[in-house]
Amino acid sequence: GGVRLSANSDRVARFEADLSGMPDVALPVIVACCLSDTPFHLTGLDTLYIKECDRVMAVTREAGKLGYGLQIPARGELCWDRVRNACTTLEIDTYQDHRMAMAFAPAGVRYCGLIVRDADVVSKSFPGFWEQYDHLVM
């Protein structure tokens, strides 16, 4: 199992996926969809409420800071229909969750000056994350 990503000119009108078999990819998928202006509807997110933090609440709140109006239509679901609001701050809280920090890192390319607070939390699973990230974006 897994996901293969590739670049092409085809644009998805709306990304829909059941992530119950791979819930840990939800956060980067959500942020990637927002950054690429791709509406989405994700299901199978039931376990995200009981991770290092309530990831559904956390990603909804932090994406909201950047102006993305995510919606929770039902427990275990999250969607975004391209609702945009004003960006209120460029400081992203991680809630001491390594996956929150890593998921929002690419937003720094779009939002100059983005600050990921408690960024060292990535050491839980990927101590060299920020060094690798710097190699990718430099």
Where do the model's predicted regions map?
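Short helix-capping/linker segments at secondary-structure and domain boundaries
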Residues: 35-42, 109-119
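Structural signal for terminal/edge beta-strands and the immediately following C-terminal loop/tail
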Residues: 113-138
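C-terminal structural cap/anchor segments
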Residues: 21-80
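Short, recurring structural edge motifs at helix starts
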Residues: 16-20, 45-48, 90-93, 115-123
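Self-splicing inteins and homing endonuclease
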Residues: 1-21, 66-96, 110-111, 134-138
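Conserved phosphate/oxyanion-binding catalytic-loop motifs
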Residues: 98-101
